[in-house]
Amino acid sequence: MKFSGIQVSILALLRVCLAEADSGEGNQEALPHANFDITYECLERDVGGLSSFMEFENGDNATLQYKFTNKEDLNVSVVGLGGRIYDVQKNEDAANISASAIGPLDVDVNGTTEFQHVIKLVLKEGDYVLSPDVYVQKENETMRVVTNPSLIRILPPPMSFFNPKFMLVQMVLGALIAAFSYFTFFKPSASYGRDAKKLKPDGSVSRMDSSWLPENHQKKK
């Protein structure tokens, strides 16, 4: 049974999340069941979640617009953003999104705040899982909350006009067009000229033997 790229991505991501849940990172633990409602959209692309890929080129920016709602019973503060990018084909991390401090943005109970995170995608061509994190401070504890992942695809770089491969293709196409034009227009013209020479009259007239005709039809001299 063959898995599609999306199915492989989901399985790979679940594997990573389970591994993180088993291994805590000090006081910055991944709490997948934290009572926060965190959604985001990509301003450059439509967020497809795990159902479709967001397509980028290497070096593009992905600007994530977050909406954070606090459903805990205490006030909290959003203090940082981070995450990771997972390589679907190699089943390993492709890049870490360096944790960056924001705010702190204080969020009351049942309160909502919005913020942005710009991620520069320096990746090779291929399929990846983007897994953003939000760092939240609750009382004296800082927790790393894993948000919903999204699939991203890095497209092959556009071919430059001066790329040797592109120039070779242009030369081959030019040679084919020239050969086609030659055999289509010039060859028939030359052949027609030779045939015309063969058919050109030389000025002589051959007489028809009319001796077999009846006497009344024979041409009188």
Curated annotation (Swiss-Prot):
Its main location: endoplasmic reticulum. Residues 193-221 are annotated as: Disordered. The keyword Transmembrane helix applies. Is probably involved in a pathway contributing to genomic integrity. The gene is IRC22. Belongs to the IRC22 family. It is a single-pass type I membrane protein. One of its GO terms (cellular component) is endoplasmic reticulum membrane. InterPro entries: TRAP_alpha (IPR005595). Residues 187-221 are cytoplasmic. The chain crosses the membrane at residues 166-186. It comes from Lachancea thermotolerans (strain ATCC 56472 / CBS 6340 / NRRL Y-8284) (Yeast). It is found in: Endoplasmic reticulum membrane. Pfam families: TRAP_alpha. This is Increased recombination centers protein 22. Keywords: Endoplasmic reticulum, Membrane, Signal, Transmembrane, Transmembrane helix. Residues 20-165 are lumenal. Residues 1-19 form the signal peptide. The keyword Translocase does not apply.
